[in-house]
Amino acid sequence: MLLLISPDGVEEALACATAAEHLDIVDVKKPDEGSLGANFPWVIREIRAAVPADKPVSATVGDVPYKPGTVAQAALGAAVSGATYIKVGLYGCATPDQAIDVMRGVVRAVKDFRADAFVVASGYADAHRIGCVNPLALPDIARRAGADAAMLDTAIKDGTRLFDHVPPEGCAEFVRLAHEAGLLAALAGSVKAADLATLTRIGTDIVGVRGAVCEGGDRDAGRIQPRLVAAFRAEMDRHARAFAAAPAAS
């Protein structure tokens, strides 16, 4: 399982660089603009320069409306600015067909520029609260659009969490559908260390966190701390070892 950490600017990216051995992907977002709020192009460039070259940089394009052309341009901007993972929050897409329209534009724009770019179609575990596409539709949307991964996050950051809206068995189905479609499955949404056993068991490929590695567990007021990144990774590795050993022990 890969660990994706989301700094909100260059200062926190430098903290991630200090803890680079413990993480896999540095994800650029702007939390005050939403769950998948997009940051400025120059911030993406500065963060790309700040973190080790062997660590991929991801960038969110935003909690986007159903405006395929607008979103495709934004996605290309993120790629030009140095991101290799491009995440799109399908916030304003009420139907799978709308979501596919948006994602096809993103895939073409980004991969025409950089063939090895990695495109992530992101939905929301709490989709029922905002009227967007069903979370379990995301793997098929991503597959039909030519994306590389399907992701779930939470749209409304009010203390509720991924498993509050899509229980573990639902997340397991999401992962299964993603894998059947040949995609990676990414899960986020106020994920905590206590969730890692379940996330490991269901076969999650990428776990995305912010609050769990911030002071006080606060994604907004807290700052990312290298020691908390290291501690979270240690828990990931512990659960991975335990899961790998379980069949042999049984």
Curated annotation (Swiss-Prot):
Molecular function GO terms recorded:
lyase activity
What SUPFAM superfamilies does the record point to? Ribulose-phoshate binding barrel (SSF51366)
A Pfam family annotated for this UniProt entry: 4HFCP_synth
Q: Which reaction does it catalyse?
A: 2 D-glyceraldehyde 3-phosphate = 4-(hydroxymethyl)-2-furancarboxaldehyde phosphate + phosphate + 2 H2O
UniProt enzyme class: lyase
Give the enzyme's EC designation.
4.2.3.153
- Which InterPro entries does the annotation name? 4HFCP_synth, RibuloseP-bd_barrel
The active site consists of K29 (schiff-base intermediate with substrate), K87 (proton acceptor)
Keywords associated with the record: Lyase, Schiff base
Q: Describe its function.
A: Catalyzes the formation of 4-(hydroxymethyl)-2-furancarboxaldehyde phosphate (4-HFC-P) from two molecules of glyceraldehyde-3-P (GA-3-P).
| Family designation | Belongs to the MfnB family.
Write the protein's name: Putative (5-formylfuran-3-yl)methyl phosphate synthase
Q: Which organism is it from?
A: Streptomyces griseus subsp. griseus (strain JCM 4626 / CBS 651.72 / NBRC 13350 / KCC S-0626 / ISP 5235)
